[in-house]
Amino acid sequence: MTKFVFVTGGVVSSLGKGIASASLAAILESRGLKVTLIKLDPYINVDPGTMSPFQHGEVFVTDDGAETDLDLGHYERFIETRMKKTNNFTTGRIYQSVLEKERRGDYLGKTVQVIPHVTNEIQEYVKRGAGIGTGDAVDVAIVEIGGTVGDIESLPFLEAVRQMSLRMGPNNSAFVHLTYLPYIAAAGELKTKPTQHTVQKLREIGIQPDALLCRADRRIPDEERGKISLFTNVAEWGVISMWDVDTIYKVPRMLHEQGLDGLICDKLRLNTPPTSLKRWDQLVYETEHPQGEVTIAMVGKYVDLSDSYKSVNEALRHAGMKNHVRVKIEHVDSETIAPGDAAEKLAKYDAILVPGGFGARGVEGKICTARYAREQRVPYLGICLGMQVATIEYARHVAGLANANSTEFDAATPHPVIALITEWKDADGTIQTRSETSDLGGTMRLGAQSSDVASGTLAHEIYGNIVTERHRHRYEANVNYLDRLRKAGLVISALTQREQLTEIVELPREVHPWFIGVQFHPEFKSTPWDGHPLFNAFIKAAIDHQKSRQPTLPAAAAS
């Protein structure tokens, strides 16, 4: 029978529920349990696909084409289980499903209400995410409830999991509450009152937490833990201190050493082998003992919020660990780069990465960046839009296609080398069609798809014969211009197997040591254990470029 751990948050948002949930999952997985995670988001958007990165951060894409919360990226990086569409749902998705049932007459004329109809629907979605009733059922499902206790948006979710816990009976569910202890410098102490109040609010709803994860900028003294225990009715050994650390990969060890996994296993009556966190310890060792450092310019337009590129940042760090170097990432606003000052802005970097994005703002700066990297032989990795701007730049300045552009940015361009995809096969095999008037939400080419890779190319060195990666885009390289680009020297090194859409472009090795653009999003498949072959190769190229720029010492004069 699948057991459930429900993770809630209080006081303030952005405390790290996703990392805490993923860390607990990683510890339980190390005990030999099959674990999954489910994220419940209380906003009314059907999914985060149309939300601004400044509002929501990165949109993480699963193999089966779901546009999901960025926490699912943490989940996949921490445990072996791959996330699916069923691992993330929102208030909007729930209400959409309830209303569709009402229109079909499934409720037999009853008045549709939050209780029981919405709360029952939430419970059904949670069970679906845990694989209950299928061959994919897990031992433990950790359910993270977004938002903070006290928010009106979260109430249906909290009521649903309270009912679910009651229906499952004792020892089949546990509640973990993440809270915040502010440090008041003037008083020189951590304050427990906000934690007392948030637990009181949770108990008013009918939920008694089994463990408290207490976030602070320092360790919580035993005296304060005892005080929290007394006023929250949580056993003192269930009051867990979570202090700030320099890498998120230290969190599993932190939680294990304070007995969180033991507490959960006792509560759920799980008889498991001992925890083994050796590979996590090795990971931390790699991060703390680099043999060098490279600096990467990430040129984009969402640079004011690092969560906008969360998976790219993590993939670069993973590749750094595989290459035994620390990767320093500097975000460069593409709107600040113009043709005359690209060298001034970019010359100091060991490699350049242009990530995905949407809209015309900052695009010309990205095109200038691609040109600088091409002409100065700086390692360049373009992801999604980063591949498209590299193609536009090459068309303009090498292939002689003046004013070439994407129809996303200039509908009247004389040379639309990038254009809207009108038909393709989706991740589940269905044929999708789109036009300029299609809705924005859920209408992109999404999910994992395979492509053939040309032999003798850089892409083939990295991937082999076949590449399978996740996609999230509406625009593609225009097939009508591929021959002209090839004749001008651009290498089209991977094409989709059915539609022959461009997946990878690169420059010949005799022209540039390492220049590649990919239409997909490789960052979504990077893990701290193996990195990702494309990012690993990119960081290796950055190391080589750094070495090539170092002055060589003159040979010692003969004596």
UniProtKB/Swiss-Prot annotation:
Region called Amidoligase domain, residue ranges: 1-270
Pfam families: CTP_synth_N, GATase
Residues binding L-glutamine: 357, 385-388, 408, 474
GO molecular function, one term: metal ion binding
Tagged with keyword Flavoprotein: no
Recorded GO CC terms: cytosol
SUPFAM superfamilies xrefs: Class I glutamine amidotransferase-like, P-loop containing nucleoside triphosphate hydrolases
Keywords from the named record: ATP-binding, Glutamine amidotransferase, Ligase, Magnesium, Metal-binding, Nucleotide-binding, Pyrimidine biosynthesis
EC numbers on record: 6.3.4.2
Pathway: Pyrimidine metabolism; CTP biosynthesis via de novo pathway; CTP from UDP: step 2/2
Keyword Oxidoreductase: no
Task performed by this protein: Catalyzes the ATP-dependent amination of UTP to CTP with either L-glutamine or ammonia as the source of nitrogen. Regulates intracellular CTP levels through interactions with the four ribonucleotide triphosphates.
Entry's family note: Belongs to the CTP synthase family.
Protein name as it appears in the record: CTP synthase
The species this protein was found in: Paracidovorax citrulli (strain AAC00-1) (Acidovorax citrulli)
